[in-house]
């Protein structure tokens, strides 16, 4: 036929059998990728330290999605929370991967069958004997079936009525586990961080989809609307389908980047806004203050801070710190976290406590500045010693650690104090192993960043695809170059060939 690469899809334009075939093949490719990617990730994933080396630090992409839907066990005998198990059951990580690969193979065979046996009786219009599809009816069927699936997911899987529930955690990502969720039917259901909204919204949306599907199955569109929206043209279906996909992609890019109950930080890592707002730092200080109020010593109060909470309060876990084109996991950047050194408290020779000003998200370098409780600069690491007034040496800054591996250790040597002041710019201080993976010390983004970038980019691309194909189907007569003053009107939705003498003509 000699079609250019950007026109090859015209071969399925008037061929419902092969149109179905290529869509089944697409499903085979998607499911096959998902299953294969899951097996690859399971081959390289290290489940031994869920606190300091969780899935998102290791760059896992599909494991978090399986986990949030209730999969926590592996046939390898480990659990995602760090425990060991003896009976993982069929629906383990490997079981889900295998199911996707088997499904992919079946779809592959079905696609071949439908490509070979394309001229089926079901696709023929008995009035004309030509291939045709009742698109409004097909729309109703798909809407009804997707409504059933949506309702079933919300009413059974999420609620635990028939299924495991979903991943639910506290606001600071410390106690996450898979559990059933009750639907939230009040105003709280509209809070994106309330898991109950996931159940109630799926039940409500599924019910609406079922009713809308039944409506479109039982009510035919008016003729003027049918013609006005080109409902007989398959490119109309393509355009509106692309619209649904790009809208969904924009929505999930937002819920991933800004955070929600559907994107727990234990599975995808913290958001950049939690660093920007000092979210974890405030909670840590609140817990320490509560400990001091109970007559604990500073050392005891800091020792009770969970290592997991301290690790979230580290800039290396901020997804906005990794460049878009820095390939690899977070562990390939700053290294594998081994342990929390503790919280450094800086003091000048007068005994005044000083706080290191933290590095903002979009800075690669930042001056080391130490301020007191009132925000007044008391010490720094100067760029030019000759003009220095507040250098660590001049002010006599010391550092003492509370909690962590260096609990109770203090340093007064200026070089050591400056080293820890620089590291305190990046949040809580951790020992990082860069040797194992030959990590280069340059921050990487988390799967939260990759997912957002990918979905926002494709959503924009698909938005233009929607405009393109929508314009083609709505203004097809204009693009085909038909004289607007033509006395007879060609019905393009039903007849493809221009200039065909057998094409029916209808007076305007």
Curated annotation (Swiss-Prot):
The chain crosses the membrane at residues 21-36, 101-115, 140-156, 203-218, 237-252, 457-472. One of its GO terms (biological process) is photosynthetic electron transport in photosystem II. One of the components of the core complex of photosystem II (PSII). It binds chlorophyll and helps catalyze the primary light-induced photochemical processes of PSII. PSII is a light-driven water:plastoquinone oxidoreductase, using light energy to abstract electrons from H(2)O, generating O(2) and a proton gradient subsequently used for ATP formation. The keyword rRNA-binding does not apply. This is Photosystem II CP47 reaction center protein. PSII is composed of 1 copy each of membrane proteins PsbA, PsbB, PsbC, PsbD, PsbE, PsbF, PsbH, PsbI, PsbJ, PsbK, PsbL, PsbM, PsbT, PsbX, PsbY, PsbZ, Psb30/Ycf12, at least 3 peripheral proteins of the oxygen-evolving complex and a large number of cofactors. It forms dimeric complexes. Its main location: plastid. Pfam families: PSII (PF00421). GO terms for molecular function: chlorophyll binding; electron transporter, transferring electrons within the cyclic electron transport pathway of photosynthesis activity. It is a multi-pass membrane protein. The keyword Nucleotide-binding does not apply. It is found in: Plastid, Chloroplast thylakoid membrane. InterPro entries: PS_antenna-like, PS_II_antenna-like_sf, PSII_PsbB. Keywords: Chlorophyll, Chloroplast, Chromophore, Membrane, Photosynthesis, Photosystem II, Plastid, Thylakoid, Transmembrane, Transmembrane helix. Binds multiple chlorophylls. PSII binds additional chlorophylls, carotenoids and specific lipids. One of its GO terms (cellular component) is photosystem II. Belongs to the PsbB/PsbC family. PsbB subfamily.
